[in-house]
Amino acid sequence: MTRKLALIAAVVVAVALALWWLTVPATVPAAALPAYTPNLDNGRAMFNAGGCASCHATPNDDPDKVDRTKLGGGLALKSPFGTFYVPNISSDANDGIGGWSEADFVTALWKGTAARRGRHLYPAFPYTSYQHIQLADVRDLFAYLKTLPPVPGRVRRHDLGFPFNIRRLLGLWKLLFLHGGPYVPDPAQSAQWNRGAYLVNGPGHCAECHSPRNMLGAIIDSQRFAGGPAADGKGWVPNITPTGLQHWGDDNTAWTEKDIASYLSDGMNPAGDYAGAAMAEVIRNTALLNADDRAAIAAYVASLPPRQGPKPPAKRTDK
């Protein structure tokens, strides 16, 4: 009996050590980054493409009065797992990322790891998409962020229940769902299509909202871009594959590629309605992109394969 217990204990310890090793937060070493001169204009473009200000700008009750250069964080993101509070990513050395190295920043976007603290970041920060951003663009973005003003003040901790408050478990989540690397252009497609695919799947992280998720909070790949319930449980994010865009709204309006590009500029859809809720904030960002990038996004989105996503709840009819 004693030998059996000892064997069981040894197995438990071995499994625990294996899991501990498998869930070590991954990092990008500084030695992996060759000498580079950042392009601040491109960094600003990546800032807008990624919608950084939409989440990280210090909140204001009036969205029109938000200073998009002050990235003090604090926005509450409600989810089935609890409430996440968006961190300060201003250039403040103590409360923001002013003390980060370039390798720290690349590590956060590619690996979902807070390198200086040696711990996993929650995927409420969409590193499953940001891992596809090319290195030069990550470095340009970091350089641009450092030009923005420091904002003192540390954001409160996430409000998560057990077991979601155990960050180390995210290492197992990453083993399942964090795969891939920087975007590699498809030689069979045009330069415009590849640019759109890159912006949509990388910095734009469009699938993070426009896709349903499984019980572990990961995107269901077979229904990518097919819409689903909003992360906070309020409202519905539409299907942006042809299944949704060719039968839009109550009158089954069909979107053209030109309609998509125009919508990303002014927020008005083919039915004459304007973007609201979270999408209005997205339009604030896409409107700042150049026309070629908006056209590239439109070309890629228009090429998506039709996919049937979960069905939205029936609209209430007041009697």
Please give the residue ranges for each predicted region.
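Electron-transfer interface patches adjacent to heme c in soluble/periplasmic c-type cytochromes
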Residues: 70-104, 128-136, 223-269, 281-295
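Electrostatic cytochrome c docking/interface patches
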Residues: 26-48, 62, 172-201, 319
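Membrane-interface motif at the C-terminal end of an N-terminal transmembrane signal
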Residues: 15-30
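C-terminal capping alpha-helices of c-type cytochrome domains
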Residues: 17-21, 101-115, 129-155, 255-270, ...
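The canonical Cys-X-X-Cys-His
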Residues: 43, 49-59, 105, 141, ...
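N-terminal Sec-pathway targeting helices
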Residues: 1-14
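Surface-exposed interaction/gating patches
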Residues: 166-254, 258
